[in-house]
């Protein structure tokens, strides 16, 4: 963003863990975004209390309260960190008013965005969906494999600390699996995808860990080397906006044992005969801006959402900059 371009003003709906972490990231770390409002429904929530202390306009009356704020017209982008059902109602109110929505729920009303894979594909969309924490962590790996060879089936298992799962996450478990599975196919490129989430009750809490399994039909070692290189490049890319994202161990590519009924996992009508399984083990440590370091699942969502908002900031702010140049 140039020096003459104004900062893009954002609002956050949802004053829980994700919403509060978004606010902290915008205030402390973004050079192109600025907070315009924090919206909640619990006047005693920690998120609203922190926002007030930081001088951010607040309302505990939900989206209706946001509409009544004196600076509502100045807000360009709205992050929705509520729930899938709540987002449907919020979008119905806000989209007609010309606000850009970044949806951090599994509602998936708009196109999926995973910054490391398709950051520039939906820059003009009125409402984009950030998939899920498991999707943000694992879909880049599926895409990295797909760029080298077709993926007949991809399965991801996201294990997160139970303490990091708030009411919104717990209420959306079914939507999590459905949305992530769909995005594994549409963004990751797998012909069939499956997602599993595990809430790990261990105490002290463990950081987010993800397993990605891909079935491929590629027996040659050269392709295997290319897959490993593609995955490492992708991990490095994601780590530019989620520094705690890393491989837990080396990528494993193993032959599918004879007689293994892997074809039962494939999409209906898929004639592929998988020869190898690619196994990738990841961990995601949070940046601890607001959330504990073990909550990498929440940190990767907020980091991805901010990354997308910053990527479209020039487009949103450009008209004002152009007007200023003509004065």
From Swiss-Prot:
Please give the Pfam families that the UniProt record associates with this protein.
AcetDehyd-dimer (PF09290), Semialdhyde_dh (PF01118)
Query: Which residue positions are annotated as catalytic?
Result: 133
Q: List the disulfide bonds.
A: none
Q: Which UniProt keywords apply?
A: Aromatic hydrocarbons catabolism, NAD, Oxidoreductase, Plasmid
- Which BP terms in the Gene Ontology apply to this protein? catabolic process
Q: Which reaction does it catalyse?
A: acetaldehyde + NAD(+) + CoA = acetyl-CoA + NADH + H(+)
Q: Which Gene3D superfamilies match?
A: Dihydrodipicolinate Reductase, domain 2 (3.30.360.10), NAD(P)-binding Rossmann-like Domain (3.40.50.720)
Q: Where does NAD(+) bind?
A: 15-18, 164-172, 297
The EC number(s) this enzyme carries: 1.2.1.10
Q: Does the keyword Isomerase apply?
A: no
**One GO molecular function term?**
acetaldehyde dehydrogenase (acetylating) activity
SMART domains with a match to the protein in the record: Semialdhyde_dh
HAMAP family, alphabetized: Ac_ald_DH_ac (MF_01657)
Homology family: Belongs to the acetaldehyde dehydrogenase family.
- What is the protein's name according to its record? Acetaldehyde dehydrogenase 5
Per the UniProt record, the source organism is Rhodococcus jostii (strain RHA1)
């Amino acid at each position: 963003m140039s020096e003459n371009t104004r900062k893009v003003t954002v609002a956050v709906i949802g004053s829980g863990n994700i919403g509060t972490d978004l606010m902290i990231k915008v205030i402390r770390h973004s050079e192109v975004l600025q907070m315009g409002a924090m919206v909640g429904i619990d006047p005693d929530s920690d998120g609203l209390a922190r926002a007030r202390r930081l001088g951010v306009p607040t309302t505990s009356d939900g989206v209706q309260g946001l509409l009544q704020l004196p600076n509502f017209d100045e807000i360009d982008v709205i992050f929705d960190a509520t729930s899938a059902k709540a987002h449907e109602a919020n979008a119905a109110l806000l989209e007609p008013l010309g606000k850009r929505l970044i949806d951090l729920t599994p509602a998936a009303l708009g196109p999926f965005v995973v910054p490391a894979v398709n950051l520039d594909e939906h820059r003009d969309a009125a409402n984009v969906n950030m998939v899920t924490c498991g999707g943000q962590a694992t879909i880049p790996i599926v895409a990295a494999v797909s760029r080298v060879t077709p993926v007949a089936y991809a399965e991801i298992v996201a294990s997160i600390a139970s303490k990091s799962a708030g009411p919104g996450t717990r209420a959306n478990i079914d939507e999590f699996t459905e949305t992530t599975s769909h995005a594994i196919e549409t963004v990751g490129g797998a012909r069939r995808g499956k997602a599993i989430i595990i809430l790990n009750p261990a105490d002290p809490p463990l950081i987010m860990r993800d397993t990605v399994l891909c079935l491929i039909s590629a027996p040659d070692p050269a392709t295997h080397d290319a897959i490993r290189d593609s995955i490492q490049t992708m991990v490095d890319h994601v780590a530019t906006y989620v520094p705690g994202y890393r491989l837990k161990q080396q990528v494993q590519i193993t032959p599918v044992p004879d007689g293994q009924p892997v074809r039962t996992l494939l999409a209906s009508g898929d004639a592929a005969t998988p020869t190898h399984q690619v196994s990738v083990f990841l961990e995601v440590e949070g940046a601890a801006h607001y959330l504990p370091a073990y909550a990498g699942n929440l940190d990767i969502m907020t980091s991805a959402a901010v990354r997308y908002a910053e990527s479209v900031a020039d487009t949103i702010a450009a008209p004002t900059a152009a007007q200023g140049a003509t004065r």
